[in-house]
C-alpha cells in the first residue's frame, strides 16, 4: 500500500469530514501488580509513560505526512480490578489517579481500563473497583471506566446490573462528566479502540496499536450520488466506500505500530459520528429515504448500513476487531439530536436499533430523578439483546436535569436533550439479583 493510493482515496471521498478517530495503544499492566497499592500505582504510571511516551508525537507526524486528521490518541490498559485485587486496599482511586497522571504526562485525551469483568460473579477486586468508580471519575480528568455484566457464554449477572444502576446515579451526583466516561457492557471486546469502553484484554499482547476510523459524512456523500436507486445499489455503494475509509485506517495503524515498535492489533470498522454538521450517522440513514431517523424503516436502514460497512471493511485490512459497526450516540450526532427534539426518536426505538448497531443506548440524557432500579432495568434490557444475539451491547446514560432540558458536554461528546423515561417501576424485578443463565444457543462445544 503506497502514499499514491491514499491520495487517490482522499480525492475519491472528497474529504467529507473523514478522519481517523483514534489511535489507541493497549498496554498490559499485569507486570505492575504489587501487594502495596502505592507501589502498584507507581509501576502503572511508569509503564504507561515508558510505552506510550511517543504515541502523540507519532500520531501527529503521521497525520501531517498523510494530510489525514487523527483526532484522538488514547491508551487502554488491563482492567484495573485485576491489578487492584493483589492489594489489600479498600478503594482503587490511587490507581485511577496514576492513570490520569500518566495520561497528562504523555498528552493523550483519554485513558480507558478502570474496568471490571463480572459477567459471572464478583471476585475480590471487582466490587471494590465498582464502588470506587464515582470517586475515581470525579477526581480524574481523563480516566474512563467500564464494567462487563453479561456475556452470551455466561448469561447476565443481575446483582452487578443492580449495583451499576446505583453507581451510575452516584457517579452523576459526584461529577458533571462522570457518567459520560462510564459504560456498562454485555459481551465487551478486548481490543476496542473507542472510549469510554476501551480496556486491554488479558489475552492481548503486551503492547498493541488499535485504530478506529470514522466517515459517516463520506458515506452520505456517496449515497447522495445514487439517490432513488435500488437497495442493491445502496448496499454496493456503502460497501465500496467503507473499503476506502478502512484502507486508510490500515495504513495509519501499520505506520504507527512500525514507528512505535509495537504490534499492530486491529482496525475497528465502526462509523463514529461527531456533533459537527456533515458527520452524522443519522443523516446517512435519512439519505436512504427516511424523513427523520426514528420513523418506521430506521432499523432496516441501520441493518443495511451496519452490514455493508463490515463487508467493505473486512477486505481492506488484515485484522478487524473492536466494535465494528455504526455508532448511534445521541449527544454525539447532530441528526440524532434533531430527531429527539422533533419527537421522532424515543428510547424504545433506540433500544430496537441497538439490536443492529455497534454498542447500545449511548450518550443518552435521562431525568436526574430516574430511580437507580429503572437505570438497572435499562442495562438488563440492553444486556439481554446482546447476550441473546451474540453481540456487544452497552449503556452509557447520563441522569441529569429534567425532561426537555439540554445537557451540554462539549467537544466530541456534544449535547443531548433529556429524554422521557417510562415511569412504571422495575424495582421488584431488579431486587431479585442473582444470574440470568446463558441462552441455550451459547452451548457450542
From Swiss-Prot:
It comes from Streptococcus mutans serotype c (strain ATCC 700610 / UA159). InterPro entries: UPF0210. Pfam families: DUF711 (PF05167). It comes from the Bacteria. Homodimer. This is UPF0210 protein SMU_73. CDD domains: RNR_PFL_like_DUF711. PANTHER family: UPF0210 PROTEIN MJ1665, UPF0210 PROTEIN SPR0218. Disulfide bonds: none annotated. Belongs to the UPF0210 family.
